[in-house]
UniProtKB/Swiss-Prot annotation:
Alphabetical list of Pfam families matching this protein: AAA_lid_4, RuvB_C, RuvB_N
Biological-process GO terms, alphabetical: DNA recombination; DNA repair
Function recorded in the entry: The RuvA-RuvB-RuvC complex processes Holliday junction (HJ) DNA during genetic recombination and DNA repair, while the RuvA-RuvB complex plays an important role in the rescue of blocked DNA replication forks via replication fork reversal (RFR). RuvA specifically binds to HJ cruciform DNA, conferring on it an open structure. The RuvB hexamer acts as an ATP-dependent pump, pulling dsDNA into and through the RuvAB complex. RuvB forms 2 homohexamers on either side of HJ DNA bound by 1 or 2 RuvA tetramers; 4 subunits per hexamer contact DNA at a time.
Native organism: Shouchella clausii (strain KSM-K16)
EC nos: 3.6.4.-
Protein name: Holliday junction branch migration complex subunit RuvB
Gene: ruvB
CDD domains to which the protein is assigned, alphabetical: AAA (cd00009)
Domain of life: Bacteria
Length: 333
């Protein structure tokens, strides 16, 4: 898959650099007001009862702050954050080692929790429900099961695909929170905060322009800010102006709606080659030289969100809003 500046997935380098941009406390976390309010209540109640916070499932599109929220929960509850991911836990023994190393009040963050295999998942059930771990000692007829007590802890699971979680696992989360795309005003605040961390001067109008082109996603907003800052710095400009932001974003092929050249290729292909559809997913994939699964999981969600395409039983259709964006009239017949 081609690397895109508007991808919501983090690169390895970004995962490291994002650490300095992440707020440490819930009060400093911008956006997601309903989730924030509810978490604040649940955490305060748990502290009053001197209990571990109920297990939390954070779900929603990538790049919206699930990892950041997990770190904030650990900080607010006074525990250490232990981080891993679904694909990294290959065997039940791997998970057992992680669980037995936890201290009381720790937060175990499992990213991409939907990718846990079923054998590992079953080890989690008693750990989440009763804070205990069942392990089998020996083999064959002499094998016996031993139950180990675990300290009270909070599991925070993150997923972009909540529907792929098994019912038994999903039902063991006491708190479920969906993270939504951000409003431009919220993203502008995030961009301004990041600019301060970068020691860059950013005009408010430039911050809002970056926000509008960031697909409602903080990770994309921060990535665009870094690149626009590069253009301003090389251009010898003391501050990032609206004019500089627009010019740099055009150079990066990110249009006012946050669409890039791949979006253009997909949408224009539907309009010009198939008269707006309906056209099958496999046909679109062959036309733009991409895998059907990638189109469905990576490219389409934002295009659906802004109302540029529709999914129908007969295939994908380009909407009137899509035609209007490109200044094209739909051909009859």
């Amino acid at each position: 898959m081609e690397e895109r500046i508007v991808s919501a997935e983090a690169t390895e380098l970004e995962e490291q650099s994002e650490q300095g941009l992440r707020p440490k406390r819930l009060a400093d976390y911008i956006g997601q007001e309903t989730v924030k309010h509810n978490l604040a209540v649940f955490m305060e109640a748990a502290k009053m009862r001197e209990e571990a916070l109920d297990h939390v499932l954070l779900y929603g599109p990538p790049g919206l702050g699930k990892t950041t929220l997990a770190a904030i929960i650990a900080a607010e509850m006074g525990g250490e954050l232990r981080t891993t991911s679904g694909p990294a836990i290959e065997r039940s023994g791997d998970l057992a080692a992680i669980l037995t190393a936890l201290e009381p009040g720790d937060v175990l963050f499992i990213d991409e929790i939907h990718r846990l295999n079923r054998t590992v998942e079953e080890v989690l059930y008693p750990a989440m429900e009763d804070f205990c771990l069942d392990i089998v000692i020996g083999k064959g007829p002499t094998a016996r099961s031993v139950r180990l007590d675990l300290p009270p802890f909070t599991l925070v699971g993150a997923t972009t695909r909540a529907g792929m979680l098994s019912s038994p696992l999903r039902d063991r989360f006491g708190v479920m929170a969906r993270l939504e795309y951000y409003k431009p005003e919220e993203l502008a605040q995030i961009v301004e905060r990041s600019a301060t961390v970068f020691q860059a001067t950013l005009e408010p109008s430039a911050a809002l322009e970056l926000a509008r082109r960031s697909r409602g996603t903080p990770r994309i907003a921060n990535r665009l800010l870094r690149r626009v800052r590069d253009f301003a710095q090389v251009g010898g400009e003391a501050a990032i102006s609206l004019e500089r932001a627009c010019s740099a974003l055009e150079q990066l092929h990110v249009d006012p709606l946050g669409l890039d050249h791949i979006d253009d290729k997909l949408l224009k292909g539907m309009i010009e080659k198939f008269n707006g559809g309906p056209v099958g997913l496999e046909t679109i994939a062959a036309t733009i030289g991409e895998e059907a699964a990638t189109i469905e999981e990576v490219y389409e969600p934002y295009l659906l969100q802004i109302g540029f395409i529709q999914r129908t039983p007969r295939g994908r259709i380009a909407t009137p809003a899509c035609y209007a964006h490109y200044g094209v009239e739909k051909q009859n017949g």
